[in-house]
């Protein structure tokens, strides 16, 4: 029996093995059994074990390194998550704020588009063109997230009349804070004959009294004596522009005075930076010992030599050659070329700016009109104070926190036009810098000036005047600045407003033709209020962060001001109305 194995092709049987001729069946000697154990194929066992140990150690080290790397990777992920979480939270707040801003901007654009459509429709119809121009000129906007306000003659008075009209003439349901309440009580106590002209019974705040108080605050920055072709506000803006053009870099010159008004925040930022970089200590007051005690103007038209020159703003204007040196600073005659090569020591850049931007063909030499110069420096100081008060203000806080609610007394307010924050946005999230002030000058100051060319700063911002008048003065007198500070809480602040109460009483008496007060008495009372306002400006400018100080000390609560939104409206209107129940 034969078996055929295809792998080896071997035929076997009962007899001898046969090897058929095949490529796999070749003749070769027997293979040595211990061939692969020869020394040539084997090495020292100790060397092999050592190499194995080295390889094992390397593998263990690599494993440990991989384990450490894995642990570090986990810790890095945890650390990154820990650091990213607060950033993500801030980004969420910023995204919310940006969404609110976009909503407000969209609403403002819709409102502007609607207004443009309405104006264009009237223009196309060709009817009442002059009325439309007058109406649009009397439209202002104080904050970005509120609609336009249209007024007749005086924004503060017109809005006040609307407040009382919507309260159905129940005067006791409208309050303006403890400051105005104190003024009215002082008037009733000191001038009972004048008090009969107002309705103060039953705890009411008289509309007549509030209107008179606001107009008195607005008047304290005006010069009642002398004929002048330029207002203090115009002179202040010209000085700011001339200083910016003289000392600034990358200057953009305005094409007209209206564009200069819109650029005032830029000029103020530049002036503030230059004053802060100077080595000398800043002084925002005059030498009161050399000035008249009870009048703003001097009987002879000039103050004592050196009375105004210590003021930091005036010193900066003179040192930068925006204004020429004051009287007596230089001898008469020309200065030698070695000292003044350009012979421009007596050039007046403000007069040149007035000719270029206003073109009234009237010279403007402030150094020759010292009362106007003093009023101009006061206006620049007030503008710097306004710049500090409105820096980084947050108008997008939750509306329910604002005491000033436009929809409470202005009918027909569209909710989409009064956009507030959807959440309570923290004040440190929104950094507005000077954008709210820039908007205020573009949409409030410029339209106001376009309507009334000779308008003064105090007419635009009576609330800032009230803040200056509310600064407590030292017990040494109104003009005493060297009295030491005492830790005494003064609850008799009514006596410091005696000048304002006197001016209000005179204005109320002048409303009756039967009792016409003397002009001299009115001017004297007006000057006393102006001097007190000047003193308050100096005191508030000594504070680096006046808004924070006023909020921390609760001074603003006396005017019904609780938020930055309230503060901006209070500065522009002079009051914050609050409607209360009369039950």
Swiss-Prot record:
Family annotation (HAMAP family): HSV_CVC2
Any Gene Ontology biological process: symbiont entry into host cell
Pfam families to which the protein is assigned, alphabetical: Herpes_UL25 (PF01499)
Disulfide linkage: none
Region (Interaction with major capsid protein/MCP): 1-49
Protein name per its UniProtKB record: Capsid vertex component 2
UniProt keyword annotation of Magnesium present: no
Function according to Swiss-Prot or TrEMBL: Capsid vertex-specific component that plays a role during viral DNA encapsidation, assuring correct genome cleavage and presumably stabilizing capsids that contain full-length viral genomes. Participates in the interaction between the capsid and the tegument through interaction with the large tegument protein/LTP.
């Amino acid at each position: 029996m034969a078996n055929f194995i295809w792998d080896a092709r071997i035929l076997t049987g009962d007899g001898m093995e046969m090897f058929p001729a095949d490529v796999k069946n070749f003749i070769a000697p027997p293979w040595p059994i211990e061939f692969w154990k020869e020394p040539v194929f084997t090495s020292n066992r100790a060397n092999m074990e050592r190499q194995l140990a080295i390889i094992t150690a390397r593998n263990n080290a690599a494993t440990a390194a991989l384990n450490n790397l894995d642990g570090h990777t986990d810790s890095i992920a945890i650390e990154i998550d820990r650091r990213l979480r607060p950033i993500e939270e801030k980004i969420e707040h910023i995204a919310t704020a940006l969404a609110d801003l976009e909503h407000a901007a969209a609403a403002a654009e819709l409102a502007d588009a609607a207004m443009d459509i309405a104006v264009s429709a009237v223009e196309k119809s060709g009817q009442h063109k002059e009325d439309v121009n007058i109406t649009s000129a009397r439209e202002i906007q104080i904050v970005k997230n509120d609609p336009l306000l249209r007024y007749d003659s005086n924004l503060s008075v017109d809005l006040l009349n609307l407040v009382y009209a919507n309260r159905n003439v129940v005067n006791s349901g409208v309050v303006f804070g403890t400051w105005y309440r104190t003024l009215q009580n002082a008037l009733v106590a000191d001038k009972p004959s004048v008090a009969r002209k107002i309705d103060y019974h039953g705890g009411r705040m008289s509309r007549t009294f509030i209107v008179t108080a606001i107009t008195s605050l607005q008047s304290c920055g005006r010069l009642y004596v002398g004929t002048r072709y330029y207002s203090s506000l115009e002179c202040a803006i010209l000085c700011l522009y001339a200083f910016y053009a003289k000392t600034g870099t990358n200057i953009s010159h305005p094409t007209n005075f209206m564009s200069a008004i819109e650029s005032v925040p830029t000029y103020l930022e530049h002036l503030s930076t230059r004053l802060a970089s100077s080595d000398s200590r800043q002084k925002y007051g005059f030498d009161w010992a050399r000035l008249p005690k009870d009048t703003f103007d001097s009987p002879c038209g000039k103050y004592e030599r050196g009375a105004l020159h210590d003021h930091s703003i005036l010193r900066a204007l003179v040192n930068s050659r925006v204004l020429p040196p004051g009287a007596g600073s230089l001898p008469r005659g020309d200065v030698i070329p070695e000292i003044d090569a350009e012979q421009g020591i007596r050039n007046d850049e403000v007069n040149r700016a007035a000719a270029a931007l206003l073109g009234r063909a009237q010279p403007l030499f402030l150094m020759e009109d010292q009362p106007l110069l003093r009023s101009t420096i006061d206006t620049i100081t007030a503008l710097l104070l306004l710049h500090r008060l409105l820096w980084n203000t947050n108008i997008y806080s939750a509306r329910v926190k604002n005491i000033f609610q436009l929809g409470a007394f202005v009918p027909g307010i569209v909710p989409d036009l009064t956009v507030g924050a959807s959440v309570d946005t923290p004040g440190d999230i929104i950094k507005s810098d000077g954008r709210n002030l820039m908007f205020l000058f573009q949409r409030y100051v410029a339209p106001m000036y376009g309507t009334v060319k000779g308008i003064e700063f105090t007419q635009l911002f009576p609330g800032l005047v009230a803040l200056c008048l509310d600064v407590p003065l030292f017990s040494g007198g109104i003009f005493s600045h060297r009295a030491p500070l005492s830790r005494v809480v003064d609850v008799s602040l009514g006596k410091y407003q005696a000048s304002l109460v006197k001016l209000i009483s005179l204005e109320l008496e002048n409303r009756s033709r039967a009792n016409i007060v003397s002009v001299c008495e009115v001017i004297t009372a007006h000057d006393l209020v102006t001097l007190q306002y000047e003193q308050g400006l100096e005191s508030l400018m000594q504070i680096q962060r006046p808004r924070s100080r006023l909020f921390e000390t609760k001074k603003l609560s006396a005017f019904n001001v609780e938020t930055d939104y309230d503060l901006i409206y209070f500065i522009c209107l002079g009051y914050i109305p609050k409607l209360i129940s009369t039950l």
